[in-house]
């Protein structure tokens, strides 16, 4: 016998799907005879249409919205842009019929799939000079309110760039990199762009490529109306200058311009630095100063992450307590030692730990 509380599990679960029908709308006259919805096309092939005009009324998606056409809750298709109605098939969606709006009368749909979209920007040429100047100088409200602050920051950046250019010119002469005035005019913007790319997170090779590509495109835009031979001469000079700078100069991890160091030399210097650091045991101020002195030139051949990793490894604020276990006898509290109290959760007692001051980097 089965208990009365047992209930049979249904084999099928019916879920209601809400459709855009008269019954779903909750009308008082639902299920009664009423006027038809006047379904069908409202605009035909090639007819002009305006924004919001209905092109097709339908039950279900007999036709799908194509270019510049939207679809409503009841599957009504309407124009999103003014243009000309097109009924078409799309080879990328076989079995579906589309209705679109072409922006121009002589343009058929579908447009080539892998080409840029055809868009209308809705702009007209302003022939009045005064109105054209006013429109050109017009600013959005947010930018207008921040205009003074933006101009001030822009001027500060320009001053900073000029200071860097003067500094780089001096470094180039100190390192005896042979550049004439014409080459220097390309070298300084190249170095500024190189530094900016490194500051924004580019690696060395990407920063160099981006700097050269940026100056190359800028040069092509400036000289687009001049003779091709002059442009080719300038591009050749830019290539020579960038190659010379890449082989003679570099930036360290503090974004300072220094002499170029090859990857092989950097690996050798890094290995030598690690060997020297392992040989020094920090026990007093002198040994601490020795370790800090080793990091003086490390910025020139180590990346910032490598330098931070080595500093954390060899300049630990507090040495691990495992070194206390190596002592034969525990240390006693004194002026040369530091005593800390710590609660022992296993034994419910307070442990008194005495450590030498040399275990704490800040106490040296």
From Swiss-Prot:
Superkingdom: Eukaryota
Any GO CC annotation of this UniProt entry: mitochondrial large ribosomal subunit
Transit peptide: 1-19
PROSITE patterns: RIBOSOMAL_L27 (PS00831)
The keyword Ribosomal protein is annotated on this UniProt entry: yes
GO biological process: translation
GO molecular function: structural constituent of ribosome
InterPro entries attached to this UniProt entry: Ribosomal_bL27, Ribosomal_bL27_CS, Ribosomal_bL27m_C
Chief localisation class: mitochondrion
Entry's localization field: Mitochondrion
UniProt keyword list: Mitochondrion, Ribonucleoprotein, Ribosomal protein, Transit peptide
NCBIfam families recorded: L27
Role noted for this protein: Component of the large subunit of mitochondrial ribosome.
Family statement: Belongs to the bacterial ribosomal protein bL27 family.
Protein name according to UniProt: Large ribosomal subunit protein bL27m
Species whose genome carries this gene: Kluyveromyces lactis (strain ATCC 8585 / CBS 2359 / DSM 70799 / NBRC 1267 / NRRL Y-1140 / WM37)
Gene: MRPL2
């Amino acid at each position: 016998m089965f208990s009365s509380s047992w209930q049979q599990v249904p084999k099928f679960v019916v879920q209601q799907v809400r459709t855009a029908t008269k019954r779903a709308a909750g009308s008082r006259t639902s299920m009664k005879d009423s006027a038809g919805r006047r379904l069908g096309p409202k605009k035909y092939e090639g007819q002009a249409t305006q924004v919001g005009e209905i092109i097709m009324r339908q039950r279900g998606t007999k036709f799908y919205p194509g270019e510049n056409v939207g679809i409503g809750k009841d599957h009504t298709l309407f124009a999103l842009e003014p243009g000309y109605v097109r009924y078409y098939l799309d080879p990328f969606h076989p079995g579906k019929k589309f209705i679109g709006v072409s922006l121009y009368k002589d343009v058929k749909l579908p447009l080539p799939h892998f080409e840029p979209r055809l868009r209308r920007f809705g702009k007209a040429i302003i022939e009045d000079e005064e109105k054209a100047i006013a429109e050109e100088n017009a600013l959005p409200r947010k930018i207008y309110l921040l205009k003074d602050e933006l101009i001030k920051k822009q001027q500060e950046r320009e001053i900073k760039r000029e200071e860097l250019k003067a500094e780089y010119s001096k470094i180039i002469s100190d390192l005896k990199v042979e550049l004439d005035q014409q080459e220097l005019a390309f070298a300084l913007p190249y170095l500024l762009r190189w530094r900016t790319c490194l500051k924004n997170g580019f690696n060395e090779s990407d920063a160099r490529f981006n700097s050269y590509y940026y100056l190359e495109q800028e040069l092509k835009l400036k000289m687009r109306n001049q003779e091709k031979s002059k442009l080719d001469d300038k591009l050749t000079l830019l290539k020579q200058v960038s190659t010379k700078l890449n082989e003679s100069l570099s930036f360290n991890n503090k974004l300072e311009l220094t002499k170029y160091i090859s990857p092989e030399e950097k690996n050798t210097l890094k290995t030598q630095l690690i060997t020297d650091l392992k040989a020094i045991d920090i026990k007093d101020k002198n040994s601490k100063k020795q370790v800090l002195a080793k990091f003086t030139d490390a910025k020139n051949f180590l990346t910032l992450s490598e330098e931070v990793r080595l500093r954390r490894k060899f300049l630990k604020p507090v040495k691990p307590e495992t070194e206390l276990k190596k002592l034969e006898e525990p240390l006693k509290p004194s002026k040369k030692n530091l005593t800390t109290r710590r609660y022992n959760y296993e034994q419910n007692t307070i442990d008194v730990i005495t450590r030498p001051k040399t275990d704490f980097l800040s106490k040296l």
